[in-house]
Swiss-Prot record:
Role noted for this protein: Acts as the sensor component of the NLRP6 inflammasome, which mediates inflammasome activation in response to various pathogen-associated signals, leading to maturation and secretion of IL1B and IL18. Inflammasomes are supramolecular complexes that assemble in the cytosol in response to pathogens and other damage-associated signals and play critical roles in innate immunity and inflammation.
Phylogenetic classification of the source organism: Eukaryota, Metazoa, Chordata, Craniata, Vertebrata
A Pfam family per the record: NOD2_WH
Designated name of the protein: NACHT, LRR and PYD domains-containing protein 6
Gene: Nlrp6
Gene source species: Mus musculus (Mouse)
Tissue expression notes: Highly expressed in the gastrointestinal tract, predominantly in colonic myofibroblasts and in colonic epithelial and endothelial cells. Within the intestinal mucosa, highly expressed by goblet cells. Also expressed in hepatocytes and in immune cells, including CD4(+) and CD8(+) T-cells, dendritic cells, mastocytes and peritoneal macrophages, as well as in lung, kidney, bladder and gonads.
Residue ranges annotated for the NACHT domain, each copy included: 194-511
Location, primary (coarse class): cytoplasm
Amino acid sequence: MDAAGASCSSVDAVARELLMATLEELSQEQLKRFRHKLRDAPLDGRSIPWGRLERSDAVDLVDKLIEFYEPVPAVEMTRQVLKRSDIRDVASRLKQQQLQKLGPTSVLLSVSAFKKKYREHVLRQHAKVKERNARSVKINKRFTKLLIAPGTGAVEDELLGPLGEPEPERARRSDTHTFNRLFRGNDEESSQPLTVVLQGPAGIGKTMAAKKILYDWAAGKLYHSQVDFAFFMPCGELLERPGKRSLADLVLDQCPDRAWPVKRILAQPNRLLFILDGADELPTLPSSEATPCKDPLEATSGLRVLSGLLSQELLPGARLLVTTRHAATGRLQGRLCSPQCAEIRGFSDKDKKKYFFKFFRDERKAERAYRFVKENETLFALCFVPFVCWIVCTVLQQQLELGRDLSRTSKTTTSVYLLFITSMLKSAGTNGPRVQGELRTLCRLAREGILDHHKAQFSEEDLEKLKLRGSQVQTIFLNKKEIPGVLKTEVTYQFIDQSFQEFLAALSYLLEAERTPGTPAGGVQKLLNSDAELRGHLALTTRFLFGLLNTEGLRDIGNHFGCVVPDHVKKDTLRWVQGQSHPKGPPVGAKKTAELEDIEDAEEEEEEEEDLNFGLELLYCLYETQEEDFVRQALSSLPEIVLERVRLTRMDLEVLNYCVQCCPDGQALRLVSCGLVAAKEKKKKKKSLVKRLKGSQSTKKQPPVSLLRPLCETMTTPKCHLSVLILSHCRLPDAVCRDLSEALKVAPALRELGLLQSRLTNTGLRLLCEGLAWPKCQVKTLRMQLPDLQEVINYLVIVLQQSPVLTTLDLSGCQLPGVIVEPLCAALKHPKCSLKTLSLTSVELSENSLRDLQAVKTSKPDLSIIYSK
């Protein structure tokens, strides 16, 4: 039997047979010499005690050798002891059989020797990666550094920090230093985590980063003194493999051959690293497999093995690096043991340029393509996602080679993907009804995979069934992959990227609707009305669906797929968005059973993250349409946009800004516990004293740009109808307050501002009140709940005395001691104070303060004071 194809148990059986045949060949005198020499033959510092060897016959010796060394290393140990015992003829015959039946690596003995051999094997296997077009490139040449930052849990932590403008831990570029930091604690006091979750959106480069970590480990750059063996586990592939396999089998799949001492490798879990790529594809364990696997030698389903690793019940103490999408992080939390999160944020602007120049071999073409994309601000922003960057480069390369105009660009991910399809088909010279039919079938395959627990691997039989095997679209849009199996190598196919599969899945819903005109878009409605867990899985598919409903997108679908999507699909989708303003729940008056309440409590934590992200995800869907009328109609039934506990990225703000531009009259925006502190990508180099002096003489220091500047600028435009802005439990740096102050001065539609439990400096308070007191400020209602109003009262007095339009001041829930009430009442009596309503709900006031307020009421009878404890 060939060593590479043998299972773990069959290799052990072959080793046992070799040992038995060899030792039975020895005479009693030779066996005696063998036992004495074996006593003095330690392996990794251990040897079999003499008391267990002294009276052992050949059969006993075989059992003890296997028990102590494992089967395959026991064969090599036996051969070496035979040589030292001067039984060279038997040793020579054993070596021949050993190499023939167990493979060349069976002559290795110590773990350190296997470790060195394994690193060399990993370097050979992973030196090159396949691009989406199946071209192999060196990983060091193609890998472009990404930004990696602490996980989103840090957003809430900002509220607990000291007042001021501390810069959060900045995003770091993914070099070896950053990768080495992943398994360190967040601070000096915390212990080193065993599980690190690397999260990010689709196409952001999680898999490439994970493979680069494996490659750098093998090159001796990462975890050198901590990890002896590192294994890459693609979750999607392991879930789809038929049959049962143990963790030991999965480890042997990655070794040069199956004769390796897997038990000894797994015997020290604290020296192992498992990279679980794509853990968002893991479903929950079915009732038939309720418990995770705990035995590395137990043959079971891939799901149980992976679940055992995630929960640290299988090989406790091993290090885990888990990659997943944002939407799945909440579902995984309950299955992970004390994880530490890190977030991949994609390319920095500097790294986008590096990627372009790595992609284009011609420097002039690279410069032209990069300059063109850089001038298109929206398209340039989209290129922070590596897969989108690759698509943009691929399309531009084709257009440059064909001498075409680069003017046709895209503003959304959907339009970029659609342009990619058309460009690839044109470059391949394929068109016509046959290819259109193949594309439809390919979309169906993509959709079936997405709905089947995000199935990403498709067999040759799957393609044959749909008549796609050997088709033109298979060659262009699917990558062929060979997976070594127990008996034979299995050939599978997968889409060039999972996000591209989700794009085609979204397209299939529209193509399905076209086939049944005049009937409700059942497939589309089923997608939109899926439950919370499925909605998280289908978030990107839903986003693409909205993008395809763009008028231009529908026209392209008609041109390239030969179909017309019914008008009612777009109208039904709009009605679905408008229906999101109505909370779903049990009928009024319905009573919940205790069992139902228990189930809801158990699911509450799991669904919390999906619910929190739904508001932002809905905005992304609207953004993808790039149709102002559609967005305005959609938001008309969503009077308040709520974003809660979101660390806003530049792309998030681009999306939010666009939706605010399109919002209808009376629109409100509420940001709750959102991260608004900009993190610098790179520390500035210190200038010399001479340069600093020259700079101070020639230039004036520019105020820092805040994350909210684009939104603040939008608020000042005549077409923006945002009426209410509530900032709750947010840290507001001075830069944000400065930009917001400028917006308050001239925003034509803003009528209400809320600052609820938000953290500001004195400078920030002064800036905001300056904007509120500006003659052209249109804010009529000001709601304030700040930790210490004593710091703001002097600025608030100025606003009350100078603002011509402020009519409502809500200080409900605030602490108002006499030192605050006294100047407040003086300002209310001021002749230029135009206030009509003062709300003091849930406020405790002293007797003196109540008398002061009564005096204000007497002098200004039109002022309504609402007070309750």
